[in-house]
Amino acid sequence: MSRLLVLKSSILGDYSQSNKLVDEFINHFDHQQLVVRDLAQQPLPVLDFQVATALRAAGELTAEQQAIVTLSDTLIDEIKEADTLVIAAPMYNFTIPTQLKNWIDLIARAGVTFTYTEQGPKGLIEGKKAVIVTTRGGIHKDAASDIITPYLKTVLGFVGITEVEFVYAEALNMGDDFANKGLASASEHLAALTA
């Protein structure tokens, strides 16, 4: 049995292929606890001056700053309580959705999820796995245009999550035959992860 934290970031709601694939995965995954956070339906604040200063503030906080820190703490606690993160990360203009980036900006906190040492940065969230389901209109895996894979590997590794599995559903806008093959390939990969 496992505890899952599911992050959906597609703006397409019920039309989202990444959400459908993630739902398929969690329906077949043996889990005892499930937390689903739809970052498009319940958007998080954008990293701006107010958010950045709140997350770096020392000492007295304003009510607004405290609310931001409390939200960040909640998001981090969700990660700490999970064994596996399942992240739906569709490709929008070669990168992740803004909604997912907002989540990253709130959980990447010096002294909380990572620290700087004499040997360099060290992630403080350990013993977690991540499954990234990424959908794309074209074919980008292993190409220079795939910015998502190295970015998410880097940022998750930076906070200590180094066991990361990517599931690709590609060619979804290249006609029905390509789309069906891309979705079938992703479904097979997800099924293998639940076996």
UniProtKB/Swiss-Prot annotation:
It comes from the Bacteria. Binds 1 FMN per subunit. Keywords: Flavoprotein, FMN, NAD, Oxidoreductase. GO terms for molecular function: electron transfer activity; FMN binding; oxidoreductase activity, acting on NAD(P)H as acceptor; oxidoreductase activity, acting on NAD(P)H, quinone or similar compound as acceptor. Its cofactor is FMN. It catalyses: 2 a quinone + NADH + H(+) = 2 a 1,4-benzosemiquinone + NAD(+); N,N-dimethyl-1,4-phenylenediamine + anthranilate + 2 NAD(+) = 2-(4-dimethylaminophenyl)diazenylbenzoate + 2 NADH + 2 H(+). FMN binds at residues 10, 16-18, 91-94, 135-138. Its EC number is 1.6.5.-, 1.7.1.17. The keyword Heme does not apply. Homodimer. Belongs to the azoreductase type 1 family. Quinone reductase that provides resistance to thiol-specific stress caused by electrophilic quinones. PANTHER family: FMN-DEPENDENT NADH-AZOREDUCTASE 1, FMN-DEPENDENT NADH:QUINONE OXIDOREDUCTASE. This is FMN-dependent NADH:quinone oxidoreductase.
